[in-house]
Amino acid sequence: MTESETTSKKVNKRVKPVPKSTKAGLIFPVGRIHRMLKNKVPLKRVSILSSVYLAAILEYLASEVLELTISQVSIQSKEYHNVRRISPRHLLLAIKTDEELDNLIRVSTTIAGGGVIPYIHEVLKKVEQKPTHPQQKQTIKSI
């Protein structure tokens, strides 16, 4: 092989582009988020680091909600057998049981098919009454 052949082979090898998500170690698409941010910002000047940061935040929130939802599914599968799917009901219960997520998502958010949060008012709950004995009443009156 001559020198020109070896250099031409080196030139023909192109380095495959590595996605920004892979570089950042994320699953959410950093490039797509960056493009969407550029479309929304009036000056169209957005740092790539802000896109990476936003993608990381969204990925964390999604994983947190998914983890809580899976725990709700496991709780219900103990009560009702053969529960194997995540439903909107599980999602709603997971969000409402976590105080921080509830505060974050509470404002004008409705999950379709989620139902309502189970709540029994204190007045409607049965109150256990202690049995009163006539002897106890007499001792109270005598004092």
From Swiss-Prot:
Subunit note: The nucleosome is a histone octamer containing two molecules each of H2A, H2B, H3 and H4 assembled in one H3-H4 heterotetramer and two H2A-H2B heterodimers. The octamer wraps approximately 147 bp of DNA.
Cellular component terms (Gene Ontology): nucleosome; nucleus
UniProt xrefs under SMART domains: H2A (SM00414)
Family listed: Belongs to the histone H2A family.
Keyword Transport on entry: no
Localization, UniProt: Nucleus; Chromosome
Record's function text: Core component of nucleosome which plays a central role in DNA double strand break (DSB) repair. Nucleosomes wrap and compact DNA into chromatin, limiting DNA accessibility to the cellular machineries which require DNA as a template. Histones thereby play a central role in transcription regulation, DNA repair, DNA replication and chromosomal stability. DNA accessibility is regulated via a complex set of post-translational modifications of histones, also called histone code, and nucleosome remodeling.
GO annotation, biological process: heterochromatin formation
Primary location recorded for the protein, binned into one broad class: nucleus
CDD domains xref list: HFD_H2A
Keywords recorded for this protein, A-Z: Chromosome, DNA-binding, Nucleosome core, Nucleus
Alphabetized Pfam families for the sequence: Histone_H2A_C
Single Gene Ontology MF annotation: structural constituent of chromatin
Protein name: Histone H2A.z
Coiled coil: none
